[in-house]
């Protein structure tokens, strides 16, 4: 993985400033606006909006069917038509508590390094302090995702996935859903 200074340098060179156009919140191709969220993020949104868990999130749509097992991994923000349910015209209704993936878009850090997704905001001037803040957020997001993934792997390894009913496996455990 890249160091924080080298990430900040790549971000500075790519340039980025959010234009608040809302394009990243709309589906431009199937699944392009799926926003994976963890329990902590959902809880923050619940507290901020007063909405229930089910009004905010739904199971990740790709289900795995193996014999009597029916499961999926994690949650995504609900969508209304082709857009995130929290997109109002071109502004985010939950901006102060938006999920990690939204805070760090169009940048993604994984084991292969930094990926920059196509976005109208790239190529814009970004200050050095802003580039460092984005780099820090990307690193925090990567660590959070790794921690969540490890918890999910441990649950799967335990072999406790129940048969005969659809479930969601997330970092908190196994939850029933009506798929």
Model feature map: region roles:
Residues 1-179:
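Short loop/turn segments that flank or connect secondary-structure elements
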